[in-house]
């Protein structure tokens, strides 16, 4: 049986996390991949457009991002994450999940922060420098 698209996307997130960690602690700390890995449980919600309940662990992961590195939500707003993992993540659905399903409040200025290229958004991941 072939893996589901959600499983494959979670695998891609895991690969990105490992790649960031391979760049050393500094690389992992300056990227959003570790934070966004917390979204893995939410992938079925994005895949099933009729879903009204968050999968187990999804809201806890979102809460961790909102409280820790909310600026990493810009990778959803700017569609960087969906291009990286190949799963459609509509911004309106993501914020409905945050507010209506998980009862979380993203920072009020998150959209303008994301639109401002100088907003200090860490990259999704970074590639380690080649060894000499």
From Swiss-Prot:
Coiled coil segments of this chain: none
Assigned keywords, A-Z: Disulfide bond, Glycoprotein, Lipid-binding, Secreted, Signal
Covalent S-S links between cysteines: 32-74, 42-58, 59-102, 72-127
InterPro entries: Bifun_inhib/LTP/seed_sf (IPR036312), Bifunc_inhib/LTP/seed_store (IPR016140), LTSS (IPR043325)
Localization annotation: Secreted; Secreted, Extracellular space
Leader sequence segment: 1-27
One GO CC annotation: extracellular space
Source species, domain of life: Eukaryota
Glycosylation sites: 78
Gene Ontology terms, MF aspect: lipid binding
UniProt entry tagged with the keyword Phosphoprotein: no
SUPFAM superfamilies linked: Bifunctional inhibitor/lipid-transfer protein/seed storage 2S albumin
The keyword Signal belongs to this UniProt entry's keyword annotation: yes
GO biological process: pollen exine formation
Functional note: Lipid-transfer proteins that possesses lipid-binding activity in vitro. Involved in the development of lipidic orbicules/Ubisch bodies and pollen exine during anther development. May be regulated by the transcription factor UDT1 in developing anthers and play a role in tapetum development. Positively regulated by the transcription factor TDR in developing anthers and may play a role in tapetum programmed cell death (PCD).
PANTHER family in the cross-refs: BIFUNCTIONAL INHIBITOR/LIPID-TRANSFER PROTEIN/SEED STORAGE 2S ALBUMIN SUPERFAMILY PROTEIN-RELATED
Family recorded in the similarity comment: Belongs to the plant LTP family.
Name of the protein in question: Non-specific lipid-transfer protein C6
Species of the source: Oryza sativa subsp. japonica (Rice)
Lineage of producing organism: Eukaryota, Viridiplantae, Streptophyta, Embryophyta, Tracheophyta
This protein's encoding gene: C6
């Amino acid at each position: 049986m072939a893996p589901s698209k959600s499983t494959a996307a979670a695998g891609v997130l895991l690969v990105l996390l490992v790649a960031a960690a391979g760049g050393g602690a500094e690389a992992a700390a300056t990227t959003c991949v570790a934070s966004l890995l917390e979204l893995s449980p939410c992938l079925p919600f994005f895949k099933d457009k009729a879903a009204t309940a968050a999968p187990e662990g999804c809201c806890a992961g979102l809460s961790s991002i909102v409280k820790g590195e909310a600026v990493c939500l810009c990778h959803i707003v700017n569609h960087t994450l969906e291009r990286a993992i190949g799963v459609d993540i509509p911004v309106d659905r993501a914020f409905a999940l945050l507010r209506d399903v998980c009862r979380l409040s993203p920072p009020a200025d998150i959209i303008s922060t994301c639109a401002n290229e100088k907003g200090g958004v860490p990259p999704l991941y970074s590639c380690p420098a080649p060894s000499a």
